[in-house]
């Protein structure tokens, strides 16, 4: 290739120099959130984590004290982690397994009877990599009722998992999953429908 045909490299975007913008880059969270987050981290690392294995009601109470909306008879394992309790909502009989991580920089909703298995990761935040400042982007995650997030699966920001859907172990989900579908792989793809046996007829009165 001759010198005349050599493409000109693009001019790089200059780095952020404005001090206010740089400060926002370091942390965009309100001061009140930082204080609550600090208090919660102390509670989570002590009263929450070192509670008895069967004390889900106790852990539910601690989450509620920090603003979470927790339904009835939820099972929350002591080794699970929640980043911002006040951005978490769980329906009745929902389950969060051992070492599951709810990195809820944005709101996370877990529906009735939904299961988030061990070491699953719900990540409601990312960064805009098209800008050198890498500003934070938060998007809600919704896990529908009767859905199952299997072990070590990743669910990204802005994703809705439909009612009754199943996310296979170690799957990476960056797009919505329709109700009653089973997805697996990286990136997650639909592998089949989830078919349930018909409900028994109601008893005769």
Over which residues does each language-model region extend?
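Conserved catalytic-core motifs of eukaryotic protein kinase domains, centered on the activation segment
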Residues: 126-128, 132-134, 159, 193-194
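A generic secondary-structure micro-motif detector
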Residues: 48-49, 133, 151
